[in-house]
Each structure stands twice: as structure tokens, then as C-alpha cells.
């Protein structure tokens, strides 16, 4: 929604019903064309937006993103429980900001505490798709708008695991045979 506002630092001050209407409108009135996959980035937690998306959109699955911090894990655990209660399939778990590789020694430093990715994946009954390190190069490329230039082994492995976790696209039989 931020892209629809006059200024990028304008706040979206909407309550639940207006947010739900906007989500429904995006889903029903945007001409998405033929999609193999539509990714929807949601705010953390179980508030109006994630709840509306999980209840209103025909989801084939969700990917849970967490970080090692205790507070983040508590919030994410609630989202996992919400997905289970709403019978939404959890396709996988990703742990962001999992560690930093020291440029001097090459040693992994767990800036935000020990990894909890495996525990979260176990609780979610889903595979751990990967762990994303804190990487100053990635931050710089994001800020400069050049993220497509980023290349790292952890990110490549995560991308492959993420693609494998996605459901196979539904295509007519003639498309699958190459005709």
C-alpha cells in the first residue's frame, strides 16, 4: 500500500475493516494474468492483515520467516499456531539474520543468539528452507537498488529450497507435454 501514497514516509493508518477491504480488492480486482505463483509479504504476527489473507485468499501454503531472537520467535510461533488452526499449509521456515560471517576470520558469529530455525521448523511441521546470514553486501545492494547482483551460497541454497517447496503450477495437459 505504501507505493500508493503520495510520499514514501506517509503512514497507512487504517483499521481492520478497511485493510480487509483493500486486501480483498487487490486479490479480486487486480488483473494478475496467468500466475505460476503469487508471493504476498505479510507483517509479522496474527493481526488483521495476516488473518484476512489466511481466511480470504486461496493459499496453497505459507513460508514462515523468523529471526533468532526470543521475542521474534514468540511472535512467529503465534503465526504458526494461527496457520495450523486455519488449516493453512506451512511450506517451510526461513531464519533471517541467522549469523554473520566475520570478514577477518571467516568464523560464524551468532549476533542475535543461537539459531532457533530447526526448532521453529519442527514446531511448524515444515522443513527449514534455509538460514540467511547478516551480510553488509546484501544491505548495500538493496539500498542501491541492485539486489539482482547479489550472489552468495546461502542465498542460492535457500532459493533452490524455496522453489522446491512451492507447489507445482497447474497447467493444461498440452502445456505440460510441450505442445
How would you describe each model-predicted region?
Residues 14-21, 37, 44, 48, ...:
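Charged, alpha-helix-enriched surfaces in structured cytosolic catalytic cores
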Residues 22-37, 49-71:
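Inter-motif core of Ras-like GTPase G domains
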Residues 57-95:
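Helical hairpin unit composed of two closely spaced alpha helices linked by a short loop
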Residues 1-36, 101-104, 136-149:
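P-loop/Walker-type NTP enzyme "switch/lid" segment
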Residues 4-6, 44-46, 68-72, 97-101, ...:
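Conserved nucleotide-binding/hydrolysis micro-motifs of P-loop NTPases
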Residues 80-179:
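C-terminal lobe/tail of nucleotide-utilizing enzymes
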Residues 39-40, 94:
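Hydrophobic residues in beta-strands of the RecA-like P-loop NTPase core, especially within AAA+ ATPase
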Amino acid at each position: 500500500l505504501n507505493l500508493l501514497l503520495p510520499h514514501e514516509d506517509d503512514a497507512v493508518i487504517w483499521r481492520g475493516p478497511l485493510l480487509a477491504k483493500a486486501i480483498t480488492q487487490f486479490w479480486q480486482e487486480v488483473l494478475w494474468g496467468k500466475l505460476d505463483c503469487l508471493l504476498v509479504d505479510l507483517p509479522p504476527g496474527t493481526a488483521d492483515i495476516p488473518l484476512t489473507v489466511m481466511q480470504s485468499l486461496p493459499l496453497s501454503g505459507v513460508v514462515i520467516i523468523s529471526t533468532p531472537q526470543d521475542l521474534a520467535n514468540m511472535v512467529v510461533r503465534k503465526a504458526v499456531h494461527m496457520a495450523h488452526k486455519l488449516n493453512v499449509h506451512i511450506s517451510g521456515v526461513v531464519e533471517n539474520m541467522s549469523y554473520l560471517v566475520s570478514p577477518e576470520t571467516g568464523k560464524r558469529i551468532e549476533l542475535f543468539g543461537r539459531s532457533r530455525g530447526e526448532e521453529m521448523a519442527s514446531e511448524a511441521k515444515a522443513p527449514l528452507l534455509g538460514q540467511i546470514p547478516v551480510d553488509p553486501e546484501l544491505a548495500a545492494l538493496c539500498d542501491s537498488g541492485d539486489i539482482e547482483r547479489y550472489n552468495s551460497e546461502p542465498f542460492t541454497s535457500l532459493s533452490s529450497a524455496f522453489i522446491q517447496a512451492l507447489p507445482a503450477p497447474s497447467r493444461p495437459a498440452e502445456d505440460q507435454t510441450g505442445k
